[in-house]
Swiss-Prot record:
Coiled coil: none
SMART domains for the chain: DM7
UniProt key word Repeat: yes
Keyword field contains Transmembrane: no
Family of this protein: Belongs to the DM7 family.
Protein name: DM7 family protein CG15333
Length: 542
């Protein structure tokens, strides 16, 4: 492949484009590429054409570079590539363009990126030029001379010494000179071992589009107190929690907000905007707080405002800047001596480790956890079990499986009982004793069916609807309920079964509203100028 060299002033005028996607959220691993060229396949259902952005940027200058012909196996119409504006490029690229769908022929399209058995026009293709070559740590250590870089062990020891000095009361002079905010050190309290779950949960994949950790079990240790404090988070110790992200989509009252200092923090809009957390997910002692996701702030910002005083934190991706927590301290709450609390937690953990003697006995749950098979036992007159249920012989077998909810048909009213007696009298006409025994046997025969705890809720609701008016009850003692309001739990269960479609529609509407807000913020970010880190002058995005 030919080596690519690009001048800083190498630009091209963007003409009317039929395909101009917004690729800021396109995450490409930052690996070692000798020519800094990256080729990635795009998907039309994900990377859609941004019509409004194409109209806004038409006629503006966009960065470009000479695409090497050796990148493709066959001749390619180089004049058909559409170079993207800087604000629409993926993170870490200085220039890049896209070939629209059907522009490249099958012979010229990269074989490794084309799906087997693909039919129709070729998918769009992104060709980008990275800003700088970033080799892996192992390769970089082999290329450097001995003694140039500090060993990892020394860096770890410096971190331990710095944390010990801060706990003992030593205050770096550089931190005292800053008046806008204080720099805090994150201390994660040890979490008690959770009991083993009967269900297998898949690992949450690493992503950088959104980052909302749960910081309720985190302490922030600072050498001096300011109205605002900044702490570097760890994507390893403070991972992304989807439930926190869903909680941030609620009302503004649940997520208190405040204005970040304009002179310190750059304007971040759209997908890079600060995410304000609900109070139940914030550290103790803060009235408001927000999280800035990884890769949002530049390395220059960290060098200017945090520098060498920032305590290192383990990250899954060390090639991008770490996430930050910016919190507003609550002055009304009494001060907490966090140093003593941290020392107490350390001593407690050390004593627990000594008692366990590095065995699994220390993490063994106190009670035996049995896997629950059943959830609801239903009494029907049909011998065939409802869809999604299994049959049992008696109630003892159902309760042994773990069924706690019992569903039976509601007793008949006075009118219905009168009609039943009339039908029984019809059966006794003519002294037909055999038919009488048959009628009474069919009326008294009951069949039991059980539903699993993870059965389809639609199947449960349809089976209860066939009963007519169903009566639910809990098969549990007061000691087993542990303070749970059983009547209220049954009311909520009935509400979920009856209004399940409305609940689904409401949840879907919340997600659609969130998508609308994200698209609106993204379009506003395209039109908003950004501040240059060097001179502080507002520049227009290209």
């Amino acid at each position: 492949m030919d080596t690519v060299h690009r001048d800083k002033d190498q630009v091209v005028i963007l003409k009317k484009a039929n395909y101009l996607p917004y690729l800021v959220n396109l995450f490409i691993p930052k690996l070692f590429y000798p020519e800094k060229i990256v080729v990635a396949r795009l998907y039309l259902d994900v990377n859609k054409h941004d019509k409004q952005a194409a109209e806004n940027f038409e006629g503006t200058e966009t960065p470009c570079f000479d695409v090497p012909p050796s990148l493709f196996a066959d001749k390619v119409p180089m004049d058909k590539i559409v170079f993207l504006p800087t604000s629409m490029l993926p993170m870490g690229f200085e220039a890049g363009g896209v070939f629209g769908p059907g522009i490249l022929t099958r012979r010229s399209y990269p074989i490794d990126l084309k799906a087997a058995g693909h039919k129709g026009q070729t998918p769009p293709l992104f060709v980008g030029l990275r800003m700088e070559v970033q080799p892996p740590t192992r390769v970089e250590s082999l290329l450097k001379k001995d003694g140039e870089s500090q060993p990892i062990q020394d860096t770890l020891m410096n971190w331990l010494h710095a944390s010990n000095d801060l706990i003992n009361g030593a205050q770096p002079k550089g931190q005292e000179l800053r008046d806008e905010f204080s720099l805090s050190m994150v201390f994660n309290l040890p979490i008690p071992p959770s009991p083993p779950s009967p269900y297998s949960y898949g690992r949450i994949p690493l992503q950088c589009n959104i980052y909302t950790p749960d910081l309720s079990n985190v302490l922030l240790l600072m050498s001096h107190q300011r109205d605002l404090t900044v702490a570097i988070l760890s994507t390893v110790n403070n991972p992304h929690v989807p439930s926190v992200a869903f909680a941030t989509m609620g009302d503004d009252a649940e997520c208190p907000k405040f204005e970040l200092p304009i002179g310190v923090f750059p304007i971040c809009e759209g997908v890079n905007r600060p995410i304000f957390l609900p109070k139940r997910f914030m550290p103790k002692g803060f009235e408001a707080g927000c999280v800035i996701k990884p890769g949002t702030l530049s390395e220059l910002w960290f060098m200017d405002y945090i520098g060498r005083f920032g305590p290192p934190q383990p990250q899954y991706n060390g090639s991008i800047t770490p996430p930050l927590f910016v919190g507003k301290i609550c002055r009304e709450e009494p001060a907490v001596d966090m140093i003593k609390k941290i020392q107490f937690e350390i001593e407690k953990k050390a004593s627990d480790d000594a008692e366990s003697k590095a065995t699994l006995a220390g993490v063994k749950p106190k009670f035996d956890i049995s896997i629950t098979k059943g959830f609801m036992v239903m009494e029907t007159k049909e011998p065939k079990s409802p869809k999604g249920a299994y049959s049992v012989q008696n109630y003892d077998e159902a309760f042994d499986d773990g069924c706690i909810v019992r569903v039976v048909k509601k007793p008949a009213t006075a009118e219905e009982a009168t009609e039943t007696r009339e039908r029984n009298e019809m059966c006794t006409v003519g002294d037909q004793s055999q038919e009488l025994d048959k009628c009474s046997t069919e009326a008294d025969q009951k069949y039991l069916s059980c539903f699993h705890v993870d059965s389809d809720i639609d199947n449960i609701a349809m089976a209860m609807a066939r009963l007519g008016i169903a009566d639910m009850s809990l098969h549990a003692d007061e000691e087993e309920l542990c303070g749970i309001d059983g009547d209220n739990a049954l009311i909520q269960l009935r509400h979920v079964l009856e209004d399940r479609n409305q609940i689904r529609s409401h949840t879907d509407q919340l997600m659609q509203d969130h998508i609308f807000r994200m698209n609106r913020d993204r379009m506003l970010a395209l039109r908003q100028p950004f501040t240059c880190f060097g001179c502080g002058i507002h520049e227009k995005k290209q």
